[in-house]
Design a protein with these regions (language model features):
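Structured, acidic catalytic/metal-binding patches in enzyme active sites
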Residues: 1-170
C-alpha cells in the first residue's frame, strides 16, 4: 500500500525503490478518483453541487476569531467575498484549501500511477462525483468545522507551503 499526494512541483523525485517495487508487482491500483484526466466533468459536478441561493456571507459561517484569517486567506487568493455568495460551505473550504497549496496536480503521484497502470486494473474508492457528494451531504455544522479547519491551517500553510510535500517525501 502506498499513500499518494495529489500535487507536487515539477521534477520532484518521488519514485523510491519501495514504490517502484510495489508498483511493478501490483496487478491492481486503488485510488480515490480514477478519472483524474476529466477535469471538465469534475468541474461540472463541483459547480452543480456547490451552489445554493440565500446563504449567509462566508465570514458569518465562521467564529468571529477566525474571520481575520479568512480575510487574509481570501486576499492571498485574490477572492472577493461576493464570489462565495452562493457557494456552499464545503465547496468554499475546498477552494480555499488550494490557495496556499504548492505543487501542480498534473504532477500528482496518483496521476502518474494511473498512467503507469494503463494495462492493469485501476479501481476507484469513490470517484469524483461521489466524493463531492459526500461533502455536499455533510450537515452544515460539519461543513463549518471543515471551513474553520482550513482557515486555521492556512496560517501554517502560508508560512510553509511545502510542509505536506516534505512530510510525504520523507
Amino acid at each position: 500500500m502506498v499513500g499518494t499526494i495529489h500535487a507536487l512541483p515539477d521534477f520532484v523525485r518521488w519514485r523510491s525503490p519501495a514504490i517502484e517495487s510495489a508498483a511493478s508487482a501490483a496487478d491492481l491500483l486503488v485510488v480515490e478518483i480514477a478519472a483524474l484526466d476529466d477535469d471538465a466533468a469534475l468541474a461540472r459536478t463541483f459547480t452543480g453541487l456547490s451552489r445554493s441561493p440565500g446563504l449567509p456571507p462566508l465570514a458569518e459561517r465562521l467564529p468571529r476569531d477566525l474571520r481575520p484569517a479568512l480575510a487574509a486567506l481570501m486576499d492571498r487568493g485574490g477572492i472577493a467575498p461576493a464570489q462565495f455568495a452562493e457557494t456552499e460551505t464545503w465547496a468554499a473550504a475546498l477552494t480555499l484549501a488550494r490557495i496556499d497549496a504548492s505543487g501542480d496536480p498534473a504532477n500528482g503521484v496518483d496521476r502518474a500511477l494511473i498512467a503507469e497502470f494503463k494495462d492493469r486494473r485501476v479501481r476507484e474508492l469513490e470517484g469524483g462525483a461521489a466524493q463531492l457528494a459526500i461533502f455536499d451531504r455533510l450537515p452544515e455544522a460539519q461543513q463549518r468545522a471543515m471551513l474553520a479547519a482550513v482557515v486555521k491551517d492556512s496560517v501554517a500553510a502560508a508560512k510553509d507551503p511545502e510542509r505536506l510535500q516534505r512530510a510525504w517525501l520523507a
